[in-house]
Curated annotation (Swiss-Prot):
Gene source species: Tityus stigmurus (Brazilian scorpion)
Main subcellular location of this protein, as a coarse class: secreted
Further remarks about this protein from its record: The primary structure of this cryptide Pep-3 is identical to that of cryptide Pep-3 from other Tityus species (AC P0DRE8, AC P69940, AC Q5G8A6). Negative results: does not inhibit Kv1.4/KCNA4, Kv1.5/KCNA5, Kv1.6/KCNA6, Shaker IR and Kv11.1/KCNH2 potassium channels. Does not show cytolytic activity.
Family: Belongs to the long chain scorpion toxin family. Class 1 subfamily.
One Gene Ontology CC term in the entry: extracellular region
Functional description taken from the UniProt entry: Inhibits voltage-gated potassium channels Kv1.1/KCNA1, Kv1.2/KCNA2, and Kv1.3/KCNA3.
Protein name, as recorded: Potassium channel toxin Tst-beta-KTx
Cystine pairings recorded for this chain: C29-C50, C36-C55, C40-C57
InterPro entries the record matches: Long_scorpion_toxin_alpha/beta
Subcellular location: Secreted
Length: 60
């Protein structure tokens, strides 16, 4: 594994956190107006808005 090649445990956990954060980012959110509304309507049938780099779907 690529992570096993990184010797320092602290550095390894920092890199894992960065990769995890990037993987969860929805890049369409700030780039396209209405992206989150479409995203939330597709998955939850709710309205949505962009919050940073992630979509927030309306709560009941």
């Amino acid at each position: 594994k690529l992570v096993a090649l990184i010797p320092n445990d602290q550095l390894r956990s920092i890199l894992k956190a960065v990769v995890h954060k990037v993987a969860k980012t929805q890049f369409g959110c700030p780039a396209y107006e209405g992206y989150c509304n479409d995203h939330c309507n597709d998955i939850e049938r709710k309205d949505g808005e962009c919050h940073g780099f992630k979509c927030k779907c309306a709560k009941d």
